[in-house]
Regions:
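Domain-scale activation on soluble regions of proteins
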Residues: 113-115
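A residue-level signal for beta-strand positions that form part of recognition/binding surfaces
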Residues: 93, 111, 140
Length: 163
């Protein structure tokens, strides 16, 4: 018999995004070992990518399924298990900040990019030289550096330069 028992990350009525599917058929006779598993880190990466591409609701649907699995009733909401406790791949959820706000910083050009998919927002930002919050409110960017320095010469908001 099978002596190797893999962990189960979703079961029963749990929703989740499978690592691999064959919607048009053609499943291999020996598919790769993890193909039918659900990993939050992959789900968050796919969700943030969908958000970046403008498919915000599809991305949020994936996140809702993750959070329902880890809502504290059955699973620890602070320990999204993958390959052991406190596995780092779930930190891909950080990508949703960029996916929803479109915020990214170019330290060479000293440009802060904003391309919000959610309207006004206030979000955490971290660079190699500092961290704080970035806000888009009433058509204006506001950077509040809490520690260090984030040298911004211009803002690029949805493709338009704002000095």
């Amino acid at each position: 018999g099978d002596v190797y028992k893999r962990q189960v990350y979703a079961c029963g009525k749990d929703g989740g995004l499978l690592l691999c599917t064959w919607p048009k058929g053609g499943m291999l006779s020996l598919p790769f070992v993890y193909s039918n598993e659900v990993w939050t880190g992959i789900e968050y990466q796919v969700a943030s990518h969908l958000m970046m591409k403008g498919e915000v609701e599809k991305g949020l649907d994936i996140v809702r399924e993750c959070r329902e699995r880890y809502d504290g009733r059955v699973r620890n909401p602070f320990n999204e298990i993958e390959c052991g406790h406190w596995y780092a791949r779930a930190m891909a959820s950080y990508g949703m900040l960029q996916g929803l706000t479109g915020v990214r910083y170019d330290a060479v050009d000293k440009t802060m990019y904003i391309n919000s998919k959610i309207g006004d927002f206030k979000s955490f930002i971290s660079t190699d030289t500092g961290f704080g919050t970035i806000e888009w409110k009433a058509g204006k960017p506001v950077l509040n550096v809490v520690y260090g320095n984030i040298d911004v010469k211009r803002y690029n908001v949805s493709g338009k330069i704002v000095d």
